[in-house]
């Protein structure tokens, strides 16, 4: 692939791989450690998971602002150095047995992680030509799929072979490798700081809020961009539903005696589907218009969710999960390849920083609704699938009608020309 001829992208790609490897291995190994060490207190494992998602609430206002105002390369690199340092502290804290302090370190480390993606994603926009954006999104989706399929297995293998201490050391090494790869990138200053030079001394809470508000207004004024950001809300909605529905389906229907095993098989089937869909989506992204690459898989996904609720046959359930994963892959590639073309580089950090909060909010909202409805108000879990399927089909109708119109109205940004603009000049809506 031509994209791998770009040395900066190769380094950023493998930096993201190393960073994701460290995060996945460390998190999963720590979950197994808590289950072994505190088998009578499974709530500890749940609390650890909460430490990975809760920081979003506290930092979402500033992650995008930091990526836009400060040197993006240094932000991404320093995220790795800080996480490596916190991993060392975590290593020694484990020997003290002070679990509340361990949770505190996990919380801080996860909060630092939230700053990595907006900075790294903004750098990718700067170093690639627009025809490579979809390929980059596809490669990132493949990474996510691989860790989704093998993440638990890798974490379990590392925990059983080198123990929690070895897994944390591997965690540390992964962050160091990621930091060194980012440091080795040769990216022009204007691409790293498209808004001009800035320092911590100049910042204030009021300025950060104003910058965040500017990012929100920029999204709302661009109908196509707002529609794409809404796509991440839908991803969160689906993630929230499938975080618990397969488990409930197995426990109360298809396989009550071995529901843990079959829930894992569902996740693997979905992950392999994501991987296959990412490959297919990457290959056809140049031949298919992005609004079709996005809307048609959403329609098929809606129908497949009905199948998941209707079927009483395990292999059909797994096949539908695999096909559903194949639909999600192209949708993500369409969004990831489209967004950098229409977002001004001066605001790319703030736009990227909105993705995780939207997903987390939708995921939390969905989990709350499932907890409220099942089994008190909805005793048959199939109806939850049908409700989700109806919502997805309504989203398809909206996208099928709106995206072609919004796409025709949108103007693509010439990223290289944008970097030549005066730093003090406000970014125009596109």
Swiss-Prot record:
The record's subcellular location field reads:
Cell membrane
Q: What are the alphabetically sorted keywords of the record? A: Cell membrane, Membrane, Transmembrane, Transmembrane helix, Transport
One Pfam family of this protein, by short name? MFS_1
Describe the family membership recorded for this protein in Swiss-Prot or TrEMBL: Belongs to the major facilitator superfamily.
Q: How does it sit in the membrane?
A: Multi-pass membrane protein
Instruction: Please indicate if the UniProt record lists Methyltransferase as a keyword.
Output: no
Got a GO cellular component term for this one?
plasma membrane
> Does the keyword Transport belong to this entry?
yes
Please give the start and end residues of each transmembrane region. Answer: 13-33, 47-67, 88-108, 138-158, 228-248, 264-284, 296-316, 319-339, 358-378, 383-403
Q: Note the PANTHER family from the entry.
A: MACROLIDE-EFFLUX PROTEIN
Q: What is this protein called?
A: Uncharacterized MFS-type transporter YkuC
Q: Which NCBIfam families match?
A: 2A0121
Q: Which GO terms describe its molecular function?
A: transmembrane transporter activity
Q: Which domain of life is it from?
A: Bacteria
């Amino acid at each position: 692939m031509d994209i791998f001829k770009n040395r900066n992208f190769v380094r950023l790609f493998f930096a993201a791989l190393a960073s994701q490897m460290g995060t996945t291995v460390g998190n999963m190994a720590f979950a197994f450690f808590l289950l072994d060490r505190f088998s009578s207190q499974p709530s500890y494992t749940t609390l650890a998971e909460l430490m990975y998602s809760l920081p979003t609430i506290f930092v979402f206002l500033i992650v995008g602002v930091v990526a836009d105002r400060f040197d993006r390369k240094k932000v991404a690199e320093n995220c790795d150095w800080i996480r490596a340092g916190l991993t060392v502290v975590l290593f020694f804290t484990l020997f003290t047995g002070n679990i509340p302090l361990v949770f505190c370190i996990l919380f801080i480390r996860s909060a630092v992680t939230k700053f990595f993606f907006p900075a790294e994603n903004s750098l990718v926009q700067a170093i690639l030509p627009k025809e490579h954006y979809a390929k980059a999104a596809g490669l990132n989706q493949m990474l996510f799929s691989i860790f989704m399929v093998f993440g638990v297995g890798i974490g379990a293998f590392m925990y059983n072979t080198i123990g929690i201490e070895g897994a944390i050391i591997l965690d540390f090494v992964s962050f160091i490798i990621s930091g060194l790869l980012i440091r080795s990138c040769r990216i022009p200053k204007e691409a790293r700081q498209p808004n001009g030079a800035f320092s911590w001394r100049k910042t204030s809470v009021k300025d950060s809020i104003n910058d965040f508000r500017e990012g929100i207004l920029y999204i709302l004024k661009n109908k196509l961009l707002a529609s794409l950001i809404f796509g991440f809300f839908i991803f969160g909605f689906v993630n929230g539903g499938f975080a618990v529905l397969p488990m409930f389906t197995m426990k109360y229907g298809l396989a009550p005696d071995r529901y843990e095993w079959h829930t894992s098989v569902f996740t693997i089937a979905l992950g392999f589907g994501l991987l296959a869909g990412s490959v297919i989506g990457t290959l056809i992204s140049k031949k298919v218009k992005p609004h079709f690459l996005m809307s048609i898989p959403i329609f098929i996904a809606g129908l497949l969710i009905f199948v998941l609720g209707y079927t009483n046959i395990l292999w059909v359930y797994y096949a539908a999960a695999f096909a559903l994963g194949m639909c999600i892959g192209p949708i993500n590639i369409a969004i990831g390849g489209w967004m950098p073309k229409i977002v001004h580089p001066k605001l790319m950090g703030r736009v990227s920083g909105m993705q995780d909060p939207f997903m987390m909010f939708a995921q939390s909202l969905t989990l709350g609704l499932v907890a409220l409805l099942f089994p008190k108000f909805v005793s048959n879990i199939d109806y939850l699938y049908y409700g989700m399927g109806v919502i997805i089909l309504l989203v398809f109708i909206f996208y099928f009608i709106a995206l072609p119109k919004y796409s025709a109205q949108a103007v693509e940004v010439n990223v290289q020309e944008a970097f030549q603009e005066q730093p003090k000049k406000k970014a125009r809506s596109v």
